[in-house]
Amino acid sequence: MTPSLANFLNSLVAGALIVVVPITIALILISQTDQVDRKL
């Protein structure tokens, strides 16, 4: 694996974490605070 390829993969992982982690935290917080009774 070339250093540039390693840097590219690392940037992809970092970008995914930067996007996914805040969205996951926000969804968990919203689902915890939103106590609407959902009847499916």
Curated annotation (Swiss-Prot):
Where it sits in the cell: the answer is:
Cellular thylakoid membrane
Q: Does the keyword Transmembrane apply?
A: yes
Q: Which UniProt keywords apply?
A: Membrane, Photosynthesis, Photosystem II, Thylakoid, Transmembrane, Transmembrane helix
> According to its record, how does it sit in the membrane?
Single-pass membrane protein
Q: Does the keyword tRNA-binding apply?
A: no
What are the record's GO terms for cellular component?
A: photosystem II; plasma membrane-derived thylakoid membrane
Major subcellular location class:
membrane
Coiled-coil spans in chain: none
**InterPro entries, per the entry:** PSII_PsbX (IPR009518), PSII_PsbX_type_1_subfam (IPR023431)
Tell me the GO BP annotations in alphabetical order: photosynthesis
Pfam (any one): PsbX
- Membrane-crossing ranges are 11-31
Its biological purpose: Involved in the binding and/or turnover of quinones at the Q(B) site of photosystem II (PSII). PSII is a light-driven water plastoquinone oxidoreductase, using light energy to abstract electrons from H(2)O, generating a proton gradient subsequently used for ATP formation.
- Give the family per the record: Belongs to the PsbX family. Type 1 subfamily.
Q: How does it assemble?
A: PSII is composed of 1 copy each of membrane proteins PsbA, PsbB, PsbC, PsbD, PsbE, PsbF, PsbH, PsbI, PsbJ, PsbK, PsbL, PsbM, PsbT, PsbX, PsbY, PsbZ, Psb30/Ycf12, peripheral proteins PsbO, CyanoQ (PsbQ), PsbU, PsbV and a large number of cofactors. It forms dimeric complexes.
Under the heading HAMAP family, the entry gives: PSII_PsbX_1
Q: What name does the UniProt record give this protein?
A: Photosystem II reaction center protein X
To which species is this protein native? Synechococcus sp. (strain RCC307)
